[in-house]
From Swiss-Prot:
It comes from Variola virus. Its EC number is 2.7.7.6. This is DNA-directed RNA polymerase 133 kDa polypeptide. The keyword Cytoplasm does not apply. Changing residue 976 to S: In strain: Garcia-1966. It is found in: Virion. One of its GO terms (molecular function) is metal ion binding.
Length: 1164
């Protein structure tokens, strides 16, 4: 019994992370990291970025400077709630204001004199409007006193049209590990980026590349375009670190394989030969000469000393305040990795590994845009001052330059889906699935331009570094995003940290490292470098590395550093480094701690008894060594046991090899995959397809559906699922339902439900089963004069409009009805006409196939009249609509049967839905049967022994055997009726019933699987996809039907359709469709000399080619299709001559007919 209790403990600890933790300020775990990210930006980082004091221009050897100072940054929340914003049709924005002062500083003997040039106190209500993130319960970071709506999880922005916007998280381009690349055989590069810490603004970026060619080892250089000299990497390391070449040789060779040592000796010897080739070589003189040559090459306006200081001081910005000697040792450690990676490439994290990348969250998006737009703003002010001084001789700034920071345009572009000129960042939230409010903000994707042809296939594979941190099931199965977008697992989150916290944490870690004996942290020749965010701070004695890492991890868990998400990675495998990561954008998740071969969960006997009354933060405080937050880099270089069960089966010696132990399999799924049931009991593709279909499931009504002029599909009578997982419950996906329980039967029905066809009961539909309401936005823009014009002739299209020209509320719109008045008028130039004014209707019509009721109408009056109409329509299931179970058993309505046509059981109950039974075997969805069994068992005993209602926990991925669930169902039925026989009990457990034929009232020979299941209706609706029409608009060029339902399009008649008719021998039909219709008929004159199509000049047809040669062409009129004429014209325009030739033969009636011998063959 103890073993079972222990195996459940890890599951209970995992559940504690998922539930809210008010003591730690966590009210909704799935999106908490997004709330914190945006809160850090709006409350802290925005002030840091906008508060600026720096020189714009300098004159007379820097004795005169034009300065800019931005201060008094204030951020004001809106006065209204998100619902009011939706009603008004406005965006939900915070207002940021600041003061700009531009002055001139003159340095004189008496001191510095300041002369004011310009000042602007920004109080404009439209200066900077920052889209405000709506948090859990309609709260926002600036005003937490807003009333609480618990089921509103937030995580969205509202744009100016009251449309919700959500976005994915992008993988940052800059990597934290250098990128290794094989240029050609025996030629390699090692490129890396250096970014200044967050406390240094503006952020400085430097990108360096180390090149190595085996055939030219003297040219093993490091370079950076226009920011650094091109210099031998060994000599640069020697110049910075002030050590000998022998020291560098010993440092690079320590603990390296023989082949790497050979290459090290060759590189050091080549550097030595380079120094010997220069007479009286001096390393300082050598570097100075290179700097002077670069100064001349760049034609810099700075003095040589200023140029050298700028170049060397800004070298490696991430080690900005670090001595040059440590920079030199850092370069040696990089060169060590480079040389090792040449021989052991597979052991080094590649560029696609998530170990190398940080992730941009909502706050980081806005931070990056604010930083870039501020630099543009300051640059515009600088250019304006220079232009005014050049043209007028005065230092002045135009007021419009000061009042247009440009941040509004950047933020609105962000919500429109453009982040730094790339796509895929944000998108409109589709309201057909409440679940996507969670899934989209927890998605991680690559930049579109990151995916080049050369690396496309390597990126799109499931990378090993994504294991445990990403959901392996919830990935796009088709389309351009395959392999590029991944979903975080339920335990994963993304780190956030304030600048002040970052500096304090860095200081505490440095103090801890320096508390060691000085000689033990100064092993720069053969030690393990210790880096904090890639900045070298010490080099540790190799004999102390295990004790150091173990002690550091223990102190971290105990809160010694004040941050539980610090990552410490011990990189062995000859690369020898201790990496400490504290920055934002890292993927972290909890793991169970293994210390000296013992699972720390077992060492705390009090934990089990107190666990029910504790939150996750309580566990971290009172039992700090049980769980550790581990980032993805630390996880990759640690030994992690897959499960507690496997860990317990190992010997003591094997256990000591592990550092961490993982939680059960259900915690490796994302929140979308957690809505499925029994993934591990089904075939693999069902999980991927199931996640895609769960996102398309229509969910319950949103919070203020009537106030948003937005598209949406909503389930009318949703039901909470009975069979759920813990993640589904804690994320409130279960409470905000996405389906209904229906009674299904697995059987064949008159051959109608073949393949994916399903039979649905008519009375079930009439009672509101899986009924939905569709909200649709219709938007038109009308010129003001057209809107004010009055119609001269009564039009049926305007029958639903009121006298004000707008459609009236609660009117039922049909196809062809106008939604607003739009009458264009024109004046005829005819003096004899009585009325030379003509008018005609140009309004946009309602085009849907179904009638809709007008719910709301919004109007904006500017230079144009913008009308937005929200229509509602109840949509009951019809033929062709799609449904699915949570095991990816998608079906299409093939027949709607009356109750009298359906089979029934002994109680007269008929199934709501009949599904083809062979689909279970072909798709191998055993968990669908388990879900029916568990749902039926719940209906028999919906309460536990304490009288409390309890849903059935059936996790998406679980390690529970099917026999356990069968035993649970057996206990439910025995509790309800203990006198059941073994056969009756078996039938109830396995949901097998005898059904009766409705026509003969006789029982079927076989028992039928019959029971309840949670059924989902998908957004694929028949009436939204039908595009068949008899007549309609055509394109001007090829005169084929338009594409898309919105443009009134139809189905094009192309080559494949033509071939089908040819196969049927329908020659007259082809002629009629492709040629004889009045739109496609085309008369063409062909020149019989050259085969060109004749041109029409002043109503005269002539051949241009023959007329230039003074020939007399013979033009013949032929009838052909318009498309043929367009094809010939386009081919001629591309330089391809297509000659139309006529068949030369005499007419058949001029030639005598051939004689036919009618004699029988035997007489011939």
């Amino acid at each position: 019994m103890k073993k079972n209790t222990d195996s459940e403990m890890d599951q209970r600890l995992g559940y504690k992370f998922l539930v809210p933790d008010p003591k730690a300020g966590v009210f909704y775990r799935p999106l908490h990291f997004q709330y914190v990210s945006y809160s850090n930006f709006i409350l802290h980082r925005l002030h840091e970025i906008l508060t600026v004091k720096r020189p714009l221009l300098s004159f007379k050897n820097n004795t005169e400077r034009i300065m800019i100072e931005i201060s008094n940054v204030k951020v004001t929340p809106p006065d209204y709630s998100p619902i009011i914003a939706s009603i008004k049709g406005k965006s939900y924005d915070a207002l940021a204001t600041f003061t700009v002062n531009i002055f001139k500083e003159v340095m004189a003997k008496e001191g510095i004199s300041i002369t004011k040039i310009s000042s602007y106190e920004g109080k404009d209500s439209h200066l900077i409007k920052i889209p405000l993130l709506i948090g859990y319960g309609n709260k926002n970071p600036l005003d937490t006193a807003k009333y609480l709506v618990p089921n509103v999880i937030g995580g969205v922005f509202i744009n100016k049209q009251s449309v919700e916007k959500v976005g994915i998280n992008l993988v940052e381009k800059i990597t934290t590990w250098p990128k290794f690349r094989v240029v050609k055989p025996n030629s390699f590069t090692f490129s890396f980026s250096s970014v200044s810490p967050p406390n240094i603004l503006p952020t400085r970026y430097r990108h360096y590349k180390i090149s190595l060619d085996i055939s030219q080892l003297e040219a093993s250089n490091i370079s950076s375009t226009k920011t650094f000299i091109t210099v031998n990497i060994v000599l640069l390391s020697q110049y910075l670190s002030r050590v000998s070449l022998g020291f560098i040789r010993r440092s690079l060779s320590y603990d390296m394989p023989p082949e790497v040592v050979y290459l090290v000796n060759a590189i050091i010897d080549s550097a030595k030969r380079l120094t010997e080739s220069i007479t009286d070589f001096n390393i300082d003189t050598y570097i100075n000469d290179l700097v002077e040559a670069e100064h001349v090459k760049q034609k810099s306006q700075l003095t040589i000393n200023e140029f050298k200081y700028e170049m060397l001081h800004n070298f490696l910005p991430h080690m900005n305040y670090t001595p040059d000697q440590l920079k030199g040792f850092y370069m040696i450690s990089l060169l060590r990795k480079f040389l090792y990676c040449i021989y052991y490439t597979s052991r080094y994290p590649d560029r696609d590994s998530m170990v190398c990348h940080r992730i941009l969250t909502y706050g980081k998006y806005f931070e990056t845009l604010a930083h870039d737009e501020l630099e543009n703003y300051i640059g515009n002010i600088r250019n304006d001052i220079m232009n005014n001084h050049k043209n007028r001789g005065t230092y002045a700034v135009n007021i419009h330059v000061l009042t247009t920071p440009g941040l509004n345009h950047a933020f609105s572009s962000l919500l429109s889906g453009k982040f730094k000129k790339s796509d895929g960042s944000y998108r409109t939230h589709p309201h057909y699935s409440w679940m996507q409010n969670i899934s989209i903000p927890r998605s991680v994707g690559f930049y579109p331009d990151q995916v080049k042809i050369s690396k496309m296939f390597s990126v799109r594979k499931y990378h090993p570094s994504q294991y445990l941190y990403f959901c392996s099931s919830d990935v796009p199965e088709r389309g351009p995003q395959v392999g590029l977008v991944s979903q975080l697992s339920v335990l994963s989150s993304i780190t956030n940290i304030l600048t002040s916290e970052y500096l304090d944490l860095e200081k505490k870690i440095c103090e801890y490292i320096r508390s060691y004996y000085k000689d033990d942290i100064s092993y720069f020749e053969t030690g393990f470098p210790i880096t904090i965010e890639n900045a070298l701070v010490a080099s540790l004695n190799p004999n102390m590395i295990c004790d150091f890492v173990t002690d550091f991890r223990r102190r971290k868990r105990m809160g010694f550093f004040g941050n539980l998400e610090v990552g410490i990675t011990l990189v062995r495998d000859h690369m020898n480094e201790i990496r400490i990561n504290i920055g934002a954008g890292r993927l972290v998740r909890p793991f169970l701690v293994v210390d000296n071969g013992e699972l720390m969960m077992d060492v705390c006997p009090e934990l089990e008894s107190r666990l029910d009354d504790m939150t996750f933060s309580d566990i971290q405080k009172e039992f700090p060594h049980v769980i550790e937050m581990v980032d993805i880099e630390q996880f990759t270089f640690s030994n992690v046991c897959e499960s507690v069960q496997k860990f317990r089966m190992m010997s003591k010696d094997e256990r000591k090899q592990y550092d961490l132990c993982d939680f059960p399999a259900e915690f490796r799924d994302g929140y979308v995959a957690s809505s499925l049931v029994g993934i591990n009991h089904n075939s693999g593709p069902r999980a991927i397809l199931g996640c895609a279909q769960a996102k398309q499931a229509i969910s319950c009504l949103s919070s203020d559906i009537r106030n948003k002029i937005d598209n949406g599909i909503h389930l009318m009578y949703p039901e909470r699922p009975i069979v759920i997982s813990k993640a589904l419950e804690t994320s409130k996906i279960a409470a905000n339902c996405f389906g209904q329980h229906v009674t299904i039967a697995l059987m064949s029905y008159k051959g109608i439900n073949q393949e994916d066809g399903i039979i649905i009961k008519k009375q079930f539909i009439q009672r509101g089963g899986l009924d939905i309401v569709t909200a649709k936005k219709h938007q038109v823009e009308i010129p003001l004069e057209n809107f004010n014009n009055k119609e001269r002739d009564r039009s049926n299209a305007y029958s639903k409009l009121e006298s004000n020209g707008l459609v009236r509320l609660n009117a039922f719109l049909e196809s062809g009805d106008a939604m607003a008045r739009n009458i264009s008028s024109r004046t005829l130039e005819d003096d004899f006409a009585r009325d030379n004014q003509i008018s005609f209707d140009v309004s946009e019509k309602y085009t849907d196939m179904y009638k809709s009721r007008v719910e709301r109408v919004q109007v904006e009056l500017t230079d144009k009249v913008k009308v937005r109409v929200l229509t509602m329509k109840e949509r009951r299931p019809i033929l062709g609509d799609k449904f699915t179970t949570r095991t990816s058993q998608k079906g299409t309505v093939a027949y709607i049967a009356d109750e009298t046509e359906l089979p029934y059981d002994e109680n007269g109950i008929t199934p709501d839905v009949i599904i083809n039974s062979t689909s279970i075997f072909s798709r191998k969805t055993i968990s669908m049967l388990i879900e029916v069994i568990l749902t039926a068992a719940y209906s028999a005993k919906p309460y536990n022994n304490k009288g409390e209602n309890r849903p059935v926990c059936f996790p998406s991925s679980n390690e529970t055997s099917i026999d356990t669930y069968m035993q649970f169902a057996k206990q439910c039925y025995e509790h309800l009726n203990p006198k059941l026989t073994e056969k009756e009990l078996s039938d109830k457990i396995f949901c097998e019933k005898i059904l009766y034929d409705p026509e003969t009232d006789k029982p079927y020979a076989s028992k039928v699987f019959f029971g309840p299941i949670y059924y989902l209706r998908l957004r694929h609706l028949t009436q939204d996809k039908a595009t068949v029409r008899c007549r309609g608009k055509k394109t001007k060029l090829i005169r084929q039907a338009n594409e898309g339902r919105k443009r009134g399009g139809g189905i094009k008649f192309g080559e494949m359709e033509r071939d089908c008719l040819i196969a049927h021998g329908a020659a007259n039909t082809i002629t009629e469709v492709l040629k004889d219709s009045e739109e496609d008929y085309q008369d063409v004159y062909i020149c019989e000399n050259c085969g060109d199509i004749a041109a029409q000049i002043k109503s005269i047809n002539t051949c241009l080619r023959c007329s230039k040669l003074n020939l007399s062409p013979l033009l013949t009129k032929i009838d052909t299709t318009h498309v043929s004429k367009v094809f010939l014209t386009q081919m001629n325009a591309r330089g391809v001559k297509v000659k139309l030739d006529f068949e030369r033969r005499p007419p058949s009636f001029y030639k005598p007919l051939d004689k036919v011998d009618l004699k029988p063959s035997f007489l011939k």
